[in-house]
UniProtKB/Swiss-Prot annotation:
Signal peptide: 1-23
Main localization (coarse): endoplasmic reticulum
Record motif COPI vesicle coat-binding, residues: 204-217
Protein name, UniProt field: Transmembrane emp24 domain-containing protein 3
Motif (COPII vesicle coat-binding): 204-205
Family per record: Belongs to the EMP24/GP25L family.
Cytoplasmic side: 202-217
Gene giving rise to this polypeptide: TMED3
GO biological process, one term: intracellular protein transport
Phylogenetic classification of the source organism: Eukaryota, Metazoa, Chordata, Craniata, Vertebrata
TM region positions: 181-201
Amino acid sequence: MGSTVPRSASVLLLLLLLRRAEQPCGAELTFELPDNAKQCFHEEVEQGVKFSLDYQVITGGHYDVDCYVEDPQGNTIYRETKKQYDSFTYRAEVKGVYQFCFSNEFSTFSHKTVYFDFQVGDEPPILPDMGNRVTALTQMESACVTIHEALKTVIDSQTHYRLREAQDRARAEDLNSRVSYWSVGETIALFVVSFSQVLLLKSFFTEKRPISRAVHS
């Protein structure tokens, strides 16, 4: 009976840990950004709360985009032009709706795909205060904290590799399209040159006979 309680508690804490790892605070989104277009997002943030923005261009053009962040008073607190990826962290000085925008207005024909991850607030403690704790429970909590940190690392690594895979796949598809078009063009050019050579050689071996006309007196 004595070993049943710690085992049940460990299972409960592990399930809670996994649930918290699956429900991060904030939002992440991948969206399409057409050429000559701008897309803005809004989030209300309390005063003194920290928020962070990570973004990366996955496909399109030179894989770059303009990005800026404005506070509720319209002041620009972050601005970068033609960035492939970047991170920005800020602690809100005033309460209100903060706006962050992505602009592709400098591009006339390149369609972009942009990914961003917007996080608000500090991460809450993994385990609530449990008052009096036995030694076994303290060791179990320490193990759960280690597992939680490892899960966060795994999630971040999976996101990073997923973005790299999407970007590499887009580049490979673009390269494949260019190679295909180039191959078709070379095939057509080769056919035209071959046909022209055949006509030229045929003209060399064609005997030109003078046309005689009978003159009737």
